[in-house]
């Protein structure tokens, strides 16, 4: 190991809160074991999980041993939110989600080699623990006034209250840290910015139960320059890591549209580019922002990371093809559909009129027949990147991409997909 991992995280701005940083820096002079946990509260991880997850990868690359924990037990409870109780999901649903996110988690760290990662599920030691054992061995060490002082608990008590189930969540997570320390000598937990209270609970429980000194780090909460929560798509939903839930094209577009004020910070937090590379991109943003070099690099790195180089090449080709800089017929149907689905897709049923005028109106690119005719006469109407000059033009079978798709474009930038039934 050369640069200490703590120094690396510091210049990247990845340390939000921590226990004694000097002690942790000293501990990481030798290989340590650390963990981060992920509860299966949905069928997929989302973009917001990436910063803590990539912390494990950073530590592994620095010569440390990561443990990835899937919360098969804690996912049955749910970490308390600021507002309202979580919906209780069935055991079968949580088990299925735990399996799905375990597959996703395994893509981001290396499970072979000298510092091979481990994948564990806290259901292994939690599900068979009796209530009496839990209360005596774990609950005994948690003063009620400390638990009530937690910010989330205080906010809930001021509004609609909190159930004993969710109130106990921090004890379950604290016990995970103790178990991982006993089993694997794990001495560090990393987590998201909202996990500090839970992490400190685990640090305290290790000290009380085992007399062990362990450590904790949280990463910053990722927001954009306007304070909006990171990772929400243009439609308002989460950016999922599962390509069936968020297409690689939508994923790529989210990052390529990052604001100048955000892009360098995102590159520091989400990629493994060196300080020198990031400094060069920061100069590009400051001096030539119109080129959007940093945004293109961010989108490429993030899509490679989550979906692989082949998917990245496909979405970059799609982005070029939509604006006439590549051949639309070279796109596979899945990528084509994802790219045109950024806007509402018009469907033309059998027997419905399908002249270029009708298609422009149906697609929403124009709002009247007169506007459609003006667009055509001014040379601004395109189908599959071919200019259309006749008002009565209709598509033939050979025009349909993958037998059913047309890509309409008005001018240089406005496009829409049409599906011919």
Swiss-Prot record:
Binding-site residues for L-tyrosine, renumbered to this chain: 35, 169, 173
* Residue span(s) of domain S4 RNA-binding: 354-420
* Alphabetized InterPro entries for the sequence: aa-tRNA-synth_I_CS (IPR001412), aa-tRNA-synth_Ic (IPR002305), Rossmann-like_a/b/a_fold (IPR014729), S4_RNA-bd (IPR002942), S4_RNA-bd_sf (IPR036986), SYY-like_C (IPR054608), Tyr-tRNA-ligase (IPR002307), Tyr-tRNA-ligase_bac-type (IPR024088)
Annotated motif 'KMSKS' region, positions: 229-233
The terms under GO molecular function for this entry are: ATP binding; RNA binding; tyrosine-tRNA ligase activity
List where the protein spans the membrane.
Answer: none
* Places the protein is found: Cytoplasm
Instruction: List the SMART domains.
Output: S4
Quote the record's binding site residues for ATP: 232
Question: What's an example GO cellular component term for this entry?
Answer: cytosol
Per the record, the similarity remark reads: Belongs to the class-I aminoacyl-tRNA synthetase family. TyrS type 1 subfamily.
Q: What is the role of this chain?
A: Catalyzes the attachment of tyrosine to tRNA(Tyr) in a two-step reaction: tyrosine is first activated by ATP to form Tyr-AMP and then transferred to the acceptor end of tRNA(Tyr).
Q: Which HAMAP family match?
A: Tyr_tRNA_synth_type1 (MF_02006)
Q: Know the name of this protein?
A: Tyrosine--tRNA ligase
Please report the organism this UniProt entry assigns to the protein. Answer: Corynebacterium efficiens (strain DSM 44549 / YS-314 / AJ 12310 / JCM 11189 / NBRC 100395)
Taxonomic path: Bacteria, Bacillati, Actinomycetota, Actinomycetes, Mycobacteriales
In the UniProt record, the gene name given for this protein reads tyrS
